[in-house]
Structures are given as structure tokens and as C-alpha cells.
């Protein structure tokens, strides 16, 4: 009989998670939460993470720092701030193996609300430690990536008006004020949307191209969107009278089934749009110029399938995904 030898198995050492935290030291949210952010970094380090705080100094730094982290094979880039900070960070992470984590401290925090990341920073840090990693799509307009949505029309005009220097300090209240003003007065616009296999003519108040479902923290214009299905969802909000606009907004806020009557809903992988006159664009809540009026050089939207790894709660809404976690 052959003698067998029992050897004690050597425990496999868990690989240390390497991460950087990107924050803007001049933002009010960082000043307010600086002590808590540093406490969270210490908490992650106590759990075996190797974490370094990176402070931005000028526009574009968050993208550069994220890109450098991806090139250095850092496991996680943690964006501290709002959706604007996330928008800048994903420009540097797109197509990489580095995951996006979030400590939400912005005004609306649409991405955090979308996937259920707690808005208190300590709760959000628990998601970093105990959440699940998924790979999702990114939308792209011309050469810029977006995580959430692109809006053309009313919201583009509002976003660009709010970004004027005199209105930046009270951005949230300025947005509400401008929304009320533009909501009643916006004249709508005409354009053509090419979805590859079909072309549609629009007379619209706004057009939303969604990678995700939630818009502005409350409304779901692209309510069928899944952020990992390789498609953009398109919601054309048709031209309405002022009174009907109010009724439409109420239907969307309450998510009534009859909200379908106000819009045309489509999906596509590559979408081209031209308008009769230049129309303002917003991308993830940030202003981005105007639409093209040239059929030869239309405004182009596309999808980067599975372009971004994200850390989200294990309780993230299932209807937002079509694939399993990694």
C-alpha cells in the first residue's frame, strides 16, 4: 500500500488592493468633508488597502490622474465629489482594468442615487469594501465619454446658462431658477436623428440619450436603459404647450405609465443627429457646445461596450443590468 503524506496547505495571501482617492481641494464639498475623507482613507488602510490621496490643482487633473492610475495598474480610482468629478475621472479610466469607486459629495449625485451608493461618506466607503464589481458601457459623444446621459435642448440651455461665472456659486438654486424660466419659454427645435437602420424627424423640447435610467436625481426619461447592454436609450420629448409641459413633468416625476404619450422612445448603438439650428448640449450635467447643423458632419453618439469597471452595492437595482457581476 502506497504511503501518503499529508502536508499542511499554505494559505494564499490575499492580494492587496491598490487605490487612489481623487479630490478637488478648492471645492466646498472637500473642505466640508476633508476630515471624514482622511478618516475613510485610514479605514481602508486598516482593511489592507494601499491608498493614496491625490489632490487636483487645475481642470483636467482628475482625468490625468485617473489615466496615470490605469497605466500603473492601480485597482481602484475613488472619485470624491459629484457627477462632474466622476465625468472627468471616467475619461481617464475608459477601456482600462481599473475600477471606479465613488465617495459622493456633490449636489445631486445622480450615479450614486442610480446604483444605491449611500450619500453619507461612511456608508459609501462600506460599498468600496463590501460591494460588487461590474463592467458597464460608456456612452460617447464625438470624442467625450459619458456615464449617465446626454441632453439636447432645454437642459442643454439651462446647463450652459448656469455655468456662466455669475451663477456658479449657487449652482443648484440657479439650475432650478433657470429650469423654471426656460421650461416655460423654450421654443423647441427641429432635427433629424439617424439610428442606422432608420431615420426619424423630430420637433422636440429635448432629446435624452441615456446610458442609465435616472435623470437629475428624480426623473426617469430613459426608464428601460441597461448600462451594460451595448445600447443607448433615446427619449425624444415632443413639443408641447406650456400647460401640457407642466402635466408632462408631473407624469414623469410620478413615473406614471401614461408618460409614454409625451415621448418617442428608441434604442441604438450609433446615433447621428443634426438640427436646423445649433442646439445646446449637456453631458452628465456639464455643458458641451451645440449640435451640428451639417448632414455631412453630424453630432455623433456611440457606445463603448463594457468600457468601465465600477464598484456598486450588492443591492444595486437589477433592472439596470443585463449581465452578472464580475
Regions found by a protein language model. Give the residues of each.
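Catalytic core of DAGKc-family lipid kinases
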Residues: 45-47, 56, 74, 94-99, ...
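Glycine-rich phosphate/pyrophosphate-binding beta-alpha loops
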Residues: 151, 208-221
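N-terminal glycine-rich "phosphate-gripper" loop used for MgATP/nucleotide binding
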Residues: 79-83
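Gly/Ser/Thr-rich active-site loops/lids in small-molecule metabolic enzymes
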Residues: 166-174, 223-244
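ATP/nucleoside-binding phosphotransfer catalytic cores, i.e., glycine-rich phosphate-binding loops
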Residues: 2-3, 7, 33, 195, ...
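ATP/NTP phosphate-donor binding region
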Residues: 1-77, 317, 325-326
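Short acidic/glycine-rich loop or secondary-structure boundary segments that cap or lie
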Residues: 156-158, 201-203, 215-218, 242-245
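Short glycine/serine/threonine-rich phosphate/pyrophosphate-binding segments
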Residues: 62, 84-89
Amino acid at each position: 500500500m502506497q504511503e501518503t503524506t499529508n502536508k499542511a496547505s499554505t494559505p494564499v495571501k490575499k492580494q492587496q488592493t491598490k487605490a487612489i482617492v481623487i479630490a478637488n481641494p478648492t471645492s466646498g464639498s472637500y473642505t466640508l468633508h476633508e476630515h471624514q475623507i482622511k478618516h475613510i482613507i485610514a479605514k481602508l488602510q486598516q482593511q489592507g488597502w494601499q491608498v493614496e490621496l491625490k489632490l487636483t490643482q487645475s481642470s483636467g487633473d482628475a482625468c490625468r490622474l485617473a489615466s496615470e492610475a490605469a497605466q500603473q495598474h492601480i485597482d481602484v480610482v475613488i472619485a470624491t465629489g459629484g457627477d462632474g468629478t466622476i465625468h472627468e475621472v471616467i475619461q481617464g479610466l475608459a477601456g482600462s482594468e481599473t475600477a471606479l469607486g465613488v465617495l459622493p459629495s456633490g449636489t445631486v449625485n445622480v450615479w450614486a442615487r442610480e446604483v444605491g451608493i449611500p450619500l453619507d461618506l461612511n456608508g459609501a466607503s462600506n460599498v468600496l469594501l463590501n460591494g460588487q464589481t461590474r463592467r458597464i458601457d460608456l456612452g460617447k459623444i464625438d470624442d467625450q465619454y459619458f456615464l449617465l446621459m446626454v441632453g439636447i435642448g432645454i437642459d442643454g440651455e439651462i446647463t450652459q446658462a448656469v455655468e456662466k461665472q455669475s451663477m456658479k456659486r449657487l449652482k443648484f438654486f440657479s439650475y432650478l431658477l433657470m429650469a423654471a424660466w426656460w421650461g416655460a419659454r423654450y421654443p423647441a427645435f427641429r432635427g433629424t436623428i439617424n439610428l442606422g437602420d432608420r431615420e426619424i424627424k423630430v420637433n422636440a423640447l429635448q432629446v435624452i440619450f441615456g446610458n442609465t435610467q435616472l435623470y437629475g436625481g428624480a426623473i426617469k426619461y430613459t426608464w428601460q436603459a441597461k448600462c451594460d447592454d451595448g445600447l443607448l436609450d433615446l427619449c425624444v420629448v415632443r413639443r408641447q404647450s406650456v400647460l401640457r409641459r407642466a402635466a408632462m413633468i408631473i407624469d414623469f416625476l410620478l413615473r406614471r405609465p401614461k408618460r409614454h404619450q409625451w415621448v418617442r422612445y428608441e434604442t441604438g448603438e450609433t446615433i447621428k443627429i443634426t438640427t436646423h439650428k445649433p442646439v445646446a448640449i449637456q453631458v452628465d450635467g456639464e455643458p458641451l457646445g451645440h449640435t451640428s447643423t451639417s448632414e455631412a458632419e453630424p453630432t455623433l453618439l456611440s457606445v463603448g461596450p463594457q468600457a468601465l469597471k465600477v464598484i456598486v452595492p450588492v443591492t444595486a437595482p437589477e433592472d439596470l443590468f443585463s449581465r452578472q457581476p464580475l
